[in-house]
Amino acid sequence: MEFMVNCYNKSDHKLSWEGKMMKTIRKTAIVMLLFVYFLTYGVLPQVLAAGKDTPMIVVAHRAGAKVAPENTLAALEQAIRDGAPIAEIDVQQLSDGTLIVMHDSNFKRTAGEDVCVWDTEADVLSTLEVGSTFSAAYRGEQIPTLEEMLACARGRITLMIELKYTGQEDALEESVLTLLQDYDMVDECIIGSMNKGILQKMKELEPGISTVFAFLILRR
């Protein structure tokens, strides 16, 4: 969550040193008052109260990006070996409808190819390699499909599937739910998103599915 305070001075004349100092003090005071208000009456107390009696759960972010290439089968296998109860993965849709496990909307950072996910078809995946950017030991690691991740995780670890919204999707929610049903994993997965519409749609399609709304509290 971000706060931005804009202070305007309509006067065109130059301020004295004392005037500049007072202006700075006033700005600081306003920011501090807002900060105190946030701590006292804002979201933070509600968040802390909600989590007071809730046990901590370890989630392998991007399937375990600290120990293996992010969002890969290698990372998921390591998360399982390490005993993580939940692995979070990011899912996007290719132009042909294939669901892949990928965080960025472009392959540049992880695979070195400056191509957008929505401009790519499934047959291109075999040409993309995402392991060597993490470590030479993982050279050859490829981008998995959601189906491959489900097959690997079934009965072994809960998947928190974050659905990425780019505006290029076609029946994303239906496609994901169909796969979960095919693998009988509706109860083994949690659907997450920063887009409330996606979560609402998933609940309409499958009222019993677990969902989580992802949001930023603080970003630098």
Where do the model's predicted regions map?
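N-terminal amphipathic/hydrophobic targeting modules at extreme N-termini
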Residues: F3-V5, H13-K14
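Phosphate-group recognition and catalysis centered on beta-loop-alpha active-site segments
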Residues: N6-Y8, W17, K23-V31, F35-R220
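Initiator methionine at the very start of the polypeptide chain
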Residues: M1, M21-M22
